[in-house]
Amino acid sequence: MQLDEQRLRFRDAMASLSAAVNIITTEGDAGQCGITATAVCSVTDTPPSLMVCINANSAMNPVFQGNGKLCVNVLNHEQELMARHFAGMTGMAMEERFSLSCWQKGPLAQPVLKGSLASLEGEIRDVQAIGTHLVYLVEIKNIILSAEGHGLIYFKRRFHPVMLEMEAAI
């Protein structure tokens, strides 16, 4: 199997891996930016840490690294449009995205998306280059949780709501 064919088959396989949709944000001396990401996972709870993967070609990497902090906003099922904005699917400029009234500052001064299922602010502890992506290891310092809302996942290259299972009628 040729490398390009294997790469495409791998991408197709990963499209079958349901993943939570997140908007990763940062703000500081290096600027303000955000990106939609599904390559996010927990690493450990002691200390609370996450792994965030961003394409190495993204112009946002110097901003994330320069600020040294970020916020992972776990989207709810009603925030698909925001996911599309931050994925660059709508043509909305970065400045416009952050001018919407749905943002507030967290204790680490990072952009926190109101209504997210969870917003996790943290400090970037390490960045590793692996293939086409940079892997950010982030130590979480602040967590905001919401009891409201259902999940939003990306599956088969499309957004899908994940509703809480209803109790079966007896």
From Swiss-Prot:
Keywords: Aromatic hydrocarbons catabolism, Flavoprotein, FMN, NAD, Oxidoreductase. Pathway: Aromatic compound metabolism; 4-hydroxyphenylacetate degradation; pyruvate and succinate semialdehyde from 4-hydroxyphenylacetate: step 1/7. Its EC number is 1.5.1.36. Induction: By 4-hydroxyphenylacetic acid. SMART domains: Flavin_Reduct. The keyword Transcription regulation does not apply. InterPro entries: Flavin_Rdtase-like_dom (IPR002563), HPA_mOase_red (IPR011982), NADH-dep_flavin_reductase (IPR050268), Split_barrel_FMN-bd (IPR012349). Homodimer. 4-HPA 3-monooxygenase consists of a reductase component HpaC and an oxygenase component HpaB. Belongs to the non-flavoprotein flavin reductase family. HpaC subfamily. This is 4-hydroxyphenylacetate 3-monooxygenase reductase component. It comes from Escherichia coli. The lineage of its organism: Bacteria, Pseudomonadati, Pseudomonadota, Gammaproteobacteria, Enterobacterales.
